[in-house]
Amino acid sequence: MTDFVIIGAGVVGGFVARALSRYNVSVLLLEKENDVAMGATRANSAIVHAGYDAKEGTLKALLNVRGSEMMEETCRELGVKYKRNGSLVVGFNDEDKAHLEELLVRGTKNGVKGLRVIDREEILKLEKNIGESVTVALHAPTGAIVCPYELCMAAVGNAMDNGADLRCGFKVTKIEKIDGGYRVWSGEEFVEGKMVINCAGVWSDEIAEMVGDTSFSVHARRGEYMLLDRECGDLVSHTVFRCPSKMGKGILVTPTVDGNILLGPTAEDIEDKTDTSTTQAGLNAIREKATEQVKGVNLGKVITSFTGLRSVGSTGDFIINSTTDGFINVAGIESPGLTSSPAIGEYVVDMLRDMGVVLEEKADYNPIRRPMHYFKELDIDGKNEVIKEHPEFAHIICRCETVSEGEILEAIRTNPKPSDIDGVKRRTRASMGRCQGGFCTPYIVELLAKELGVPYEKITKFGGESYVNVGMTKEDV
């Protein structure tokens, strides 16, 4: 029987697994999809929030500020790109200014450092392309950006390197109490764990109900985004928010750690927890709001649009508790969940200790993971040294993002291992550029088929029935 079964391999479940992998316990991470980071972690704003928005005294406030403090060192350990670019929450009138003053007071009470409300003249010194109607802003210099799915993959991979196990394609259908723990079912299969930690995102209320916990509910909030080409990368350097509302932090314009510009998200409460469609109304709202807060947004440079679903709990705060013996909820982790994720892992460990669980630290625990994009960051001499030993790094597969065969092969062989085209994309950025895989997809299919030992026709874009090949042309002629 496994010591800890964690349900949900998003960034929260990943960091809980990583935190527990430090100790002499067995950890099994379950994921219903065919890869990690497939829910909210895959599609969000990628912001490390400073911590001014969450109400004082809430878990959101506590874990936001702690997570923000931890994030830079965590990313350094995991080899994940991190950039402290600061953020601006912009206002357009006196009412907005009053709101920003409230956020300043709240953020200061939460322990956020360096917050200031600044006027238009000072805003323009920071961002020359700020919108013409912007009059005031809250400047948060500790705000930062990361790549959320890269962070999740690194956390899960580091946990696996330290002994944790991952099982994808395991959709939990039933949980039953047994002597000494729980039996967790997926159809006719099951695993057993002494304790279960529920990190199932929008599905966490349904998982909790399987053990009789109906103390909370979760609904999905749809957020749509547009991504601009790297050519637009110098549009802004800070993350530019609007004043937040009860629905979220509003439409933002932000650089990404990979050099693109991200616009969005919208905020729409929906019943269908699987609806990740984009809508004309949503994309129109992004266009209208983004061009109001930042001028020069070139909508002709949009290379893709997408939607993410946020997990909104009924309590208004993060739900991290244990209402049933041996079963822990980590639910309702909406924004600032990405920022808070390393701190949530730490918090769950402290919670377990308070529950009397003995955790003995491993002598050989290693928090360090080699950067996923280390080859890109080498200078020309460093790259040539790698190519001498491994010539596949000289063969460019994705021309838009300059991703080599060597990088793709390394990604396929590194925990957690991808099994489809989009999995390779998230790990290497191959097919993530201007042509969106128009050139490199056949080569990625070939490499995946060879490494996984399966026919081309079995390779999918994102799992399930998303096959990209139906046969070999020359054989069918």
How should these model regions be labeled?
Residues 22-43:
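Glycine-rich FAD pyrophosphate-binding loop
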Residues 2-29:
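N-terminal Rossmann-like FAD-binding beta1-loop-alpha1 element of flavoenzymes
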Residues 46-126, 250-251:
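Dinucleotide-binding Rossmann-like beta1-alpha1 core, especially the glycine-rich loop
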Residues 154, 248, 257-258, 269-396, ...:
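C-terminal catalytic lobe of FAD-dependent flavoproteins
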Residues 15, 175-264, 268-279, 288, ...:
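Flavin-dependent oxidoreductases
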Residues 138-195:
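Helical element adjacent to the flavin cofactor pocket in flavoenzyme catalytic cores
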Residues 55-65, 90-99, 138-157, 167, ...:
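Short beta-strand to alpha-helix junction loop
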Residues 274, 404-414, 438-456:
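Iron-sulfur (Fe-S) cluster-binding segments and ferredoxin-like electron-carrier domains
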